[in-house]
């Protein structure tokens, strides 16, 4: 091949003519009513989107509440089991009469103090985890927090007043873990005044 047969490479600069692309062809006029149809579809899509956003927000709130409840109330079963231990410690202390405590030798006194400290420590540990003891002695009977075991005829207190607590109650958060077992006054001030008015007549 000779130099003549070779084609010279095109080393010239582009000529400055713009590159022309194919023109955009507008579609035919839209069908009558298609604008309204598109607006309706857009409104429906917007409505679905807003509903989905609301559902997601409700789900987020519900999940946050469930996580908080799980943290607070997750130990409910364990706490109920531990309450039996607290009750047994209290029963052990109640089994020793006050006279025996006063006349007790140092060994028995140390044992009683040890049981008291153990009970106090157990109740403090429960309280750290949201379990609180309540003693409704002298309060008006509330069936949401107490379970009436018997009625006591006592005219010195108003009817429906808790006069004896057989077993203390416990709450966890805002829920009742175990209701207090109580004795409730029957009759009382209102019943006594009604009985007096009957005697006068």
Swiss-Prot record:
Keywords: Chaperone, Cytoplasm, Stress response. One of its GO terms (cellular component) is cytoplasm. InterPro entries: GrpE, GrpE_coiled_coil, GrpE_head. It comes from the Bacteria. GO terms for molecular function: adenyl-nucleotide exchange factor activity; protein homodimerization activity; protein-folding chaperone binding; unfolded protein binding. Its main location: cytoplasm. It is found in: Cytoplasm. Transmembrane segments: none annotated. Coiled coil: none annotated. It holds the Pfam family GrpE. One of its GO terms (biological process) is protein folding. Homodimer. HAMAP family: GrpE. Participates actively in the response to hyperosmotic and heat shock by preventing the aggregation of stress-denatured proteins, in association with DnaK and GrpE. It is the nucleotide exchange factor for DnaK and may function as a thermosensor. Unfolded proteins bind initially to DnaJ; upon interaction with the DnaJ-bound protein, DnaK hydrolyzes its bound ATP, resulting in the formation of a stable complex. GrpE releases ADP from DnaK; ATP binding to DnaK triggers the release of the substrate protein, thus completing the reaction cycle. PANTHER family: GRPE PROTEIN, GRPE PROTEIN HOMOLOG, MITOCHONDRIAL. NCBIfam families: PRK14141.1. Belongs to the GrpE family. This is Protein GrpE. It comes from Bradyrhizobium diazoefficiens (strain JCM 10833 / BCRC 13528 / IAM 13628 / NBRC 14792 / USDA 110).
């Amino acid at each position: 091949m000779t130099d003549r047969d070779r084609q010279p490479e095109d080393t010239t600069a582009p000529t400055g003519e713009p590159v022309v692309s194919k023109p955009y062809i507008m579609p035919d006029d839209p069908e009558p009513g298609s604008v309204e149809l598109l607006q309706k579809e857009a409104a429906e899509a917007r409505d679905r989107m807003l509903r989905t956003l609301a559902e997601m927000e409700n789900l987020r709130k519900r999940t946050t509440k469930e996580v908080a409840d799980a943290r607070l109330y997750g130990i409910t079963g364990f706490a109920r089991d531990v309450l039996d231990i607290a009750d047994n410690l209290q029963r052990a202390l109640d089994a020793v009469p006050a006279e025996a405590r006063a006349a007790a030798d140092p060994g028995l006194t140390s044992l009683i103090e040890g049981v008291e400290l153990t009970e106090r420590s157990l109740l403090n540990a429960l309280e750290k985890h949201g379990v609180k003891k309540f003693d409704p002695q002298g309060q008006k009977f509330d069936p949401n927090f107490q379970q009436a075991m018997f009625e006591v005829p006592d005219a010195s207190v108003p009817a429906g007043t808790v006069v004896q607590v057989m077993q203390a109650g416990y709450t966890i958060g805002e829920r009742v873990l175990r209701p207090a077992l109580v004795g409730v006054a029957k009759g009382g001030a209102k019943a006594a005044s009604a009985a007096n008015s009957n005697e006068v007549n």
